[in-house]
UniProtKB/Swiss-Prot annotation:
Subunit structure: Part of the 30S ribosomal subunit.
Keywords per UniProt: Ribonucleoprotein, Ribosomal protein, RNA-binding, rRNA-binding
Biological function: One of the primary rRNA binding proteins, it binds specifically to the 5'-end of 16S ribosomal RNA.
GO biological process: translation
Keyword Ribosomal protein assigned: yes
Coiled-coil stretches noted in the UniProt entry, renumbered to this chain: none
InterPro entries: NA-bd_OB-fold (IPR012340), Ribosomal_uS17 (IPR000266), Ribosomal_uS17_bact/chlr (IPR019984), Ribosomal_uS17_CS (IPR019979)
MF-aspect GO terms: rRNA binding; structural constituent of ribosome
Family: Belongs to the universal ribosomal protein uS17 family.
CDD domains cross-referenced by the UniProt entry: Ribosomal_uS17
Gene source species: Exiguobacterium sibiricum (strain DSM 17290 / CCUG 55495 / CIP 109462 / JCM 13490 / 255-15)
Gene name of the record: rpsQ
Key word RNA-binding present: yes
Protein name, UniProt field: Small ribosomal subunit protein uS17
Pfam families: Ribosomal_S17
């Protein structure tokens, strides 16, 4: 029997990497308001497990839902989509 993978995959930007093996990722979504039809921006922060400390502040990353790893961590880093440009 084959199991399906229904875990959420989100793309966002790293806003903090000060913790060991943990990053904070902000995911922004645009939703159309039901009554007025205006597009509204929402953002949410997710604490994410980063095993090798590869992601840095400003990087665009892809994260995936996983089992609870701690009190706040429910996501893990899948890949770094785009590295931040340091000026």
């Amino acid at each position: 029997m084959e199991r399906t993978n229904n875990r959420k995959v989100l793309t966002g930007r790293v806003v903090s990497d000060k913790m060991d093996k943990t990053i904070v990722v902000t995911v922004e979504t645009k939703v159309k308001h039901k009554l007025y039809g205006k597009r509204v921006n929402y953002s949410k922060k997710y604490k994410t497990h980063d095993e090798n400390n590869t992601a840095k502040i400003g990087d665009v990353v892809r994260i995936q839902e996983t089992r609870p790893l701690s009190k706040d961590k429910r996501f893990r880093l899948v890949e770094v989509v785009e590295k931040a440009v340091i000026i």
